[in-house]
Regions:
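Hydrophobic side chains in well-ordered alpha-helices
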Residues: 121, 157-160
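Glycine-rich phosphate/diphosphate-binding loops that line cofactor/substrate pockets in enzymes
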Residues: 163-172
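Structural/interface elements that position substrates and couple domains in central-metabolism enzymes
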Residues: 147, 151-157, 170
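Active-site glycine- and acidic-residue-rich loops that bind
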Residues: 152-155, 179-184
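Acidic, Mg2+-coordinating active-site environments of NTP-dependent enzymes
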Residues: 1-146, 169
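Single conserved hydrophobic/aromatic residue that forms the stacking wall/gate
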Residues: 183-186, 190-193
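Structural beta-sheet core signal
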Residues: 34, 174-176
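Cofactor-binding loop segments of dinucleotide-utilizing enzymes, especially the Rossmann-like FAD-
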Residues: 57, 177-179
């Protein structure tokens, strides 16, 4: 959660309050699945009646946690799932980046809520190669590997650049097109990297 859509929200506190109001709409028998890597995520869960299920890469106390994270030669993640404090299965992703390990943890938490087996999840993940315009391999030309990504705010840009950092290449070139205030702010972040 970060400052985005400031044409609608006043500031970051307004954004957090909006998430909290939304979470409070969940019924008591519902589930809120939330990333503990979000700064002050408890602001969002405050006062809700639904069950809170957590996941995270940085928080070993999260209900769903990735342990023994490693990356293959294409930057695709491997990890051991820790579910409710117990080491369970190993997972191999076919998409690159730490952020996709986090996305996978969220999907595993959802699957758990619906009693979808680890084997079924692993089958689904084995065929998942990413989505259009998210670190999408476009081809090679004159010795360059072309990757397209529509990262449009600072956190996404950092995640994309982190994915690129472990991708096999000699030198990284970035073509960046800022088309909004958030993109311009992201450009400042990009220049800091």
């Amino acid at each position: 959660i970060e400052e985005d859509h400031l044409d609608f929200f006043k500031d970051i506190n307004d954004i957090r309050n909006s998430f909290n109001r939304f979470a409070n709409l969940l019924p008591e028998n519902g589930n809120l699945i939330i990333n503990t890597d979000i700064e002050n995520y408890q602001d969002i869960t405050d006062g809700i009646k639904a069950k809170v299920i957590t996941y995270g890469i940085s928080d070993e106390t999260a209900d769903f946690y990735a342990k023994n994270i490693s990356y293959d030669e294409n930057g695709c993640g491997n990890f051991t799932l820790v579910r409710y404090g117990k080491e369970t299965e190993k997972y191999q992703l076919h998409v690159s980046g730490r952020h996709n390990i986090s996305n996978c943890l969220a999907a595993l938490a959802v699957a758990d809520c619906y009693d979808i087996s680890a084997k079924q999840v692993q089958m689904g993940l084995s065929g998942f190669r990413g989505t259009e315009r998210r670190f999408e391999y476009k081809g090679e030309k004159n010795g360059f590997t072309i990757i397209d990504d529509y990262a449009h705010h600072p956190t996404e840009i950092k995640a994309t650049l982190s994915s690129a950092a472990v991708y096999p290449h000699q030198k990284l070139w970035v073509a960046f097109q800022p088309v909004s205030y958030t993109h311009l702010r992201a450009h400042e972040t990009l220049s800091d990297l």
